[in-house]
Amino acid sequence: MKKLLSTLLLSLGLAAGLAQASPAAPASGKDFEVMKSPQPVSAPAGKVEVIEFFWYGCPHCYEFEPTIEAWVKKQGNNIDFKRVPVAFRDDFLPHSKLFYAVSALGISEKVTPAIFNAIHKQKNYLLTPQAQADFLATQGVDKKKFMDAYNSFSVQGEVNQSAKLLKDYAIDGVPTVVVQGKYKTGPAYTNSIPGTAQVLDFLVKQVQDKKL
């Protein structure tokens, strides 16, 4: 609950802390956590599975987005990267459906920065499907295609699955990144956005070298 509150309440103190660097040698129990109940990994052979749990409305996820995007590009074929939107409350669900709808249309990577900016810069919170469709239309997305995806059984199934993953991975705050179904980290652990990328580098390398 403490991590959830720190995620949802943006403070100047935490924002300042996020600019600090993480220790050079990441430590278990501080910079990352070994999950008590590791989860199955579905990454292709030779790749390390990395899952980011996030919420479009989370200010820290918005701050973290450029870093995680750059980190994923840097890792390239080393990792199998996935995102899972979380809904700690029912009023978060429209954002989960938004993510899976744009993913179904194959435009998630293209529109995610614009969605974050709309919510956090323009204060257009995109809490209804109509508001989402209207906004995405400004990004060149066909409203009908979006609404069809939003209301589809497949998108609802993805939302239901994300709720299960939230429990299975014991996620209590975002952004949280899980490496290889077992190692959990994020800015709430490292108190640093750049430091989180360093810890992710460490975890991926350790998994690759079979040291973790």
Swiss-Prot record:
SUPFAM superfamilies per UniProt: Thioredoxin-like
Keyword Repressor: no
An example Gene Ontology molecular-function term: disulfide oxidoreductase activity
CDD domains to which the protein is assigned, alphabetical: DsbA_DsbA
Intracellular or extracellular location(s): Periplasm
PROSITE patterns hit by this protein: THIOREDOXIN_1, THIOREDOXIN_2
Signal peptide (from-to): 1-21
Alphabetical UniProt keywords: Disulfide bond, Periplasm, Redox-active center, Signal
Primary location group: periplasm
Disulfide-bond pairs as recorded: C58-C61
Protein task: Involved in disulfide-bond formation. Acts by transferring its disulfide bond to other proteins. Involved in the production of protease and alkaline phosphatase, motility, metal resistance, and multi-drug resistance.
Family: Belongs to the thioredoxin family. DsbA subfamily.
Identification of the protein by name: Thiol:disulfide interchange protein DsbA
